[in-house]
């Protein structure tokens, strides 16, 4: 099982996302269920190492946000066209 630590994002938009990426993080969103969508920032290197395994896309993952565990599945992944970088991930609540 994969566990990912995340921070809540207060800023959104192109500039905020670029600042995250230069800080070795990237934006993600958690949606679905009866709760409101939650914008989070994830550590790029940790998630990059996890997503190499096929189980990352098929199993239920745990994202820890402010000490609260959220069970999710990876729904959509956006990658850089030619660099080995993740740009954004959509997670749906499990």
From Swiss-Prot:
InterPro entries: Rbsml_bL25/Gln-tRNA_synth_N (IPR020056), Ribosomal_bL25/Gln-tRNA_synth (IPR011035), Ribosomal_bL25_short (IPR020055), Ribosomal_L25_dom (IPR029751), Ribosomal_uL5_bac-type (IPR020930). GO terms for molecular function: 5S rRNA binding; structural constituent of ribosome. Keywords: Ribonucleoprotein, Ribosomal protein, RNA-binding, rRNA-binding. GO terms for biological process: translation. CDD domains: Ribosomal_L25_TL5_CTC (cd00495). GO terms for cellular component: cytosolic large ribosomal subunit. Belongs to the bacterial ribosomal protein bL25 family. This is one of the proteins that binds to the 5S RNA in the ribosome where it forms part of the central protuberance. Part of the 50S ribosomal subunit; part of the 5S rRNA/L5/L18/L25 subcomplex. Contacts the 5S rRNA. Binds to the 5S rRNA independently of L5 and L18. PANTHER family: RIBOSOMAL PROTEIN L25/GLN-TRNA SYNTHETASE, ANTI-CODON-BINDING DOMAIN-CONTAINING PROTEIN, RIBOSOMAL PROTEIN L25_GLN-TRNA SYNTHETASE, ANTI-CODON-BINDING DOMAIN-CONTAINING PROTEIN. This is Large ribosomal subunit protein bL25.
